[in-house]
Amino acid sequence: MKREPDFFGEQELILVYIAKKLKEALRLEKVLTDAGFDYVVEPDRYSGGIIFLSERVGAFFYVAPASEQAARALLENAGFRPYLSE
């Protein structure tokens, strides 16, 4: 279920996905909600483009640390490529 950040208290949330398009974000929200995950989604900026880099806005999806592995597995099974930190 989509939550506000304060629902998670002082937990350091884990970024699991960056949706670049609204349709993609809405689909992912449905997948996470249907599976019963609590998550936060917030707009933020990322760099995109191959030849011409530009700053874009996407939907950043976060989950609690205890849900990270299960959420990543769910995303992969649903055809999404989870965000991997560098």
Can you say where each PLM-predicted feature lies in the sequence?
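Acidic/polar low-complexity segments and flexible, solvent-exposed patches
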Residues: M1-E86
